[in-house]
């Protein structure tokens, strides 16, 4: 064996021949025959792993690596064997054993320094040992030895080692790592933050934010990273080296965010002020707070900045008061410090007094066209004359009439009223004169402005001036073709057609002017075709009050030419009432009523016909009135026709007796729907009964029975039965029953009536249950609709040949009738 082979674990000693047994002879011969081949060594090692001791395995592996030092496979097997052997030993206690393995790795790396797996094994092994410097240097050697394409394998171990080492060592390692992997900058920043390298962390944030290609592996956006940087700068204001040398301008950074991130302005203003507070620059912090509360655009941001400002002032005052208290205890007098405290307290009180104004400023910055907020600002100044005038002046200059939010004309009016209350009517008029020239958003606002001006003159008893102002307001060409709703024209061009303006004008002239002046105004309204029904009524009433009745009637007629129904109905109603009250000639009144009913919709005809008929009854002939009522029954709507027939019948009976109503009843029964015709038949029959015409009444009952289903209208049949009991005989009663069965059979064959029958019976059941114990006998006669139909199908044939009657059902009905009328004749006994 060569001297080199005698090396074991890096030292020279005698060969361990006792580790070679007779069984190893074959393997030793193979090695001698092929000294440069790894195959016999691998076979030898495999045999020893299965049958040899640990010392024998180490002996063979050591010889193999000495014999073939460039064999990666042999070295890996040997190193794995040695590291596994001491894996469970404490690295601090058995440091010597670990150093032996370290020496093996160093020997292996002499020729295998391009093998990343050997480096990884060595580095992992070193990381188990308390050898930070050696481990760091070995990592560096690995990075220098391996090509850059394999550096990731080393960095995967180097980064956890750096984090565990912490401190400056970790920072230096990460700086090198950032050169090849800038995408992990967030982890580096976190490390810098942990070790207190705040300035470098801020610089790294700036580098990241300035790199448009940077993508956060944690999914953070640009704003989130920027916010983290600002938070770092503010929280560690005294530890971050800001200035030209470091390239970190904190105020510029935060102000750029204030301009860029509108929804975060309040938070950023507070952050900037906090930065200066922590650096001890209280005056600069106060300047920042002042700038913040005067520039923020939302109430939320204002509240945030203002509350922080107030808290800052309170803390400063509190600290100064504490120092002042300590001075007082010691008996020390410091007038300058006390004066400074007084100044700060006055400043704080002034700040709190300014809060409503500052808040109002915020709302006006949001929308300078908000009229209501300008009014609130005026109210805040109270009796401060100069500030109120300045506020009104600023408001008028700031508000754009077309974009005004709220009644802009009211702002002008209140401005004028302010001078009016101060007795300066001349200035108020100047304001009003300017106001009516403003291009308001709508004609209504301009009209209100003119009216406000006139009302101001009226309040100061300048009636003629008020009339002159309104005349100027409504001034227009003789034949104006302007469309009131044409938005392309200015309000000043359309205001002369404002009904609100004319209404005020006519009321004003009517109260302070003559009748002729008022008539001219009304006529002008009609010329401009802006009259309303109220205008017509007011004009007519005005003429009537001055005894110009005929002219009043003409006004109604002009109004009727302008308006159609339903407005015309109200005008006709008033016109006809006035005409009748004036007792003009009957012929003229008839002509008016004929005009009124001509083309009148059925919905409105009833009232006019009743008035017409009443006129004929009072001043004409009764026959004429009856003809009018007869026309009314045809002209009115279906809802009013039954009432009209009833009224007609009543009037005919009172004027010409009951017999004269027969034709009316017949027409009503023919014209009305079944439900109303049934009621009309009952009234007709009662009338004939009062006249003693029993047969005619019976015939009417028979006629009405065709649209009276016994199940849904039992009241009709009950009334007919009572009639027959009182005025009939056995034959007539049987005929009534026959008709009843025939009608019931007819309705039973019609599927459309089954549902209505069921509904009627359920209602009867509810009514019977509602009557309590006294209605129990009646409950037996009330049955389910479908059960009744089945019973009818099982019933024997009746005595009416043409139909099949429901005998049992009729018997039940008859029994119910007997229970209700004890005097009725028992037909069943007669038949027996």
Curated annotation (Swiss-Prot):
Superkingdom, taxonomy of origin: Eukaryota
Keyword Nucleus among record annotations: yes
InterPro entries: HAT, HAT_Syf1-like_N, HAT_Syf1_central, HAT_Syf1_CNRKL1_C, Syf1-like, TPR-like_helical_dom_sf
Family matches, as SUPFAM superfamilies: TPR-like
Gene Ontology CC entries for this record: post-mRNA release spliceosomal complex; Prp19 complex; U2-type catalytic step 2 spliceosome
Subcellular location field: Nucleus
Ranges for the HAT repeats: 18-50, 52-84, 96-128, 130-164, 196-235, 245-278, 280-315, 383-421, 423-459, 476-508, 513-545, 547-581, 584-618, 656-690, 692-726
Protein's GO biological process: generation of catalytic spliceosome for first transesterification step
Location (main, coarse): nucleus
Coiled coil regions, renumbered to chain: none
Keywords attached to this entry: mRNA processing, mRNA splicing, Nucleus, Repeat, Spliceosome
Its job: Involved in pre-mRNA splicing and cell cycle progression.
Assembly behavior: Associated with the spliceosome.
Family: Belongs to the crooked-neck family.
Name the UniProt record assigns to this protein: Pre-mRNA-splicing factor SYF1
Upper taxonomic lineage: Eukaryota, Fungi, Dikarya, Ascomycota, Pezizomycotina
